[in-house]
Amino acid sequence: MGKTTVPVPAWLVMSDITSRPYIDESRQAYAFSSEDAAEEFAEKVGKAHVRVLDQGMDVGAMSECYAAGAGTLIELSGRHSSRHTLEAAGLARRYYNPDLNADVSRYISTRRMEYIGNMHRCRFIVPVRISNHPQMSVVYATAVFPDARFWYLAFTDLEEYGKWNAANEGWAPLEVRVDGLYRIGRKHGFLLDPCGARLLISKGMLRKIMKGRVEEDA
């Protein structure tokens, strides 16, 4: 009889803000073989916590890290560490938008506007409702704030969209690039990932993102 391989658990560092795997400015995610070491690291970086993975860093866990924006996974065991390059090929088949998720995480952590500017290369998901009666009309979902201002909703990927859509039926996800995003929300701005990062993209931030797109196309 062949030997049964027992999975070795791992502890993955998670972001308190996005509720997804934590990534640093170099787009690295971190997993540890020791819970204590993982907790110490999470406390050091701040606004992070630890999640135990009973099956270790399997394909599903690596897919989560990639979806959150990680390009590299760092696994640490005592004094030893290993690096794994993460690419969509070989991971769980799903919709990925890692560049935007990485820019969101890094902007929230650093407040450096360069990460907002980077978004001109990214895709966004917006909820849309189309009616053909009595004539065709297109409606985009919004969030109304206590001060009566409203912001359009947008999402980094289908996972974040699904969190919101579970309680909001009748909408369909539409993928747009930044020029489409700008046309929709240039007068009001966007609330990005309302069930996750809750990042407000103001009209000024939208203009900065759009400026990057125009300059790249020139």
What are the functions of these language-model segments?
Residues 1-218:
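An interfacial alpha-helical scaffold signature
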